[in-house]
Amino acid sequence: MGELLADHTTLRLGGPAHRLLTHTDPATWPDVARSASGEGTAPFVLGGGSNTLADDAGYSGTVIRMATHGATVRPLGDDLVEIVAQAGEPLSALVAFAVDHGLSGIEYLGGIPGTTGAAPVQNTGAYGQQISDTLAYVTAFDWHLDRIVELRASDCGFGYRASTFKSQPGRWTILNLTLHLTRSASAAPVTYRHLADAMAVPLGVRPPLAEAAQAVIADREQRGLTLPDSGPDARQAGSVFLNPVLTPDQESAVRRVGGPVHRDQNGPPRASAGWLLEQCGYRPGSRIGPGVYCSTARTLTLTTRESATATSFASALRQLATEVVEAYGIPLCPEPVRPGLTKGSSNVPAMPSHRAVANPSSPNRPSTAGSRPW
């Protein structure tokens, strides 16, 4: 019986790994790779476990827990500075490190759970800033080529919460990132209205770097976007669905009923996944299934209790996605990664052809049958 993955994921779900290796020293990576490459099943790399839904049966192969830490700084000339960060370094710690050194470019990513190495996979972003904005290249181990490679940012296929690493799971293990940041006392311009309001500044203003970083943390804590150490929301994986892309007709329909529509830079219009769930009757604290609830702070974050299983959590995701697509015709894409799924597999079981039945014990949970507003 191997080590439980539940002990290494923030949902605290998951059975045993056949073998778990903890990688702490960058210099020993060749030994780790050699040890893991002899098995038929590709190793699964685990960072902070904050975006992972491990199966109840566990994982039949090797799990590599990335626990390398540290970052180095090198001036590149003028105000440009290079930071090389190890993959196991917590992203929040890297942001704090950059801000403390007066380096701008990732200050709006503070407070996001997870490791630095996971950031390029999801192209982690917040408040109009994403890791690809300042990423120069990624150093990774290519399991197909059996060697360490360097990938330029332009080769990483970055998009909204998307990358080549995400679309080809199992091929690369990210070892470190190289970022190009700017030495500046000012943060990037504020582009999100609620953050500007919280800081009492107009949109487009470049506030002091440290002040912006502190405001981001405070805003995330107030909105339930951080990972608490204890309490009913401690077992979670953050937002469980991506904000879905809208067709022109869907965008018009959402705007017509007062729904929020977001655009990141020059990206396509997206609806708020949380807003769609709320239109289906879900609220903070709603019970979705056995041991699975909306967090007490926000609908889009699901939390688990002692009675939860990975199966019940996956079923809850399926139920929510089914209700939204049947009510609004808008499919939702789940965020949590499931170890063992191959390229082309969905993160959640296939949605049933019949409508999911609303859970009668969910508070503030009105029926949405036949309520499609457009």
Feature roles, as predicted:
Residues M1-L145:
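Anion-binding (especially nucleotide phosphate/pyrophosphate-binding) glycine-rich loop
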Residues G2, A6-T10, T52, I148-T311, ...:
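Phosphate/pyrophosphate- and phosphate-bearing ligand-binding catalytic cores of soluble enzymes
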Residues V32-A36, T191, S315-A321:
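Short amphipathic alpha-helices in soluble, non-transmembrane regions
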Residues D100, A310-A316:
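Beta-rich strand-turn-strand
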Residues A314-V357, N364, R372-W374:
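Conserved glycine-rich phosphate/nucleotide-binding loop
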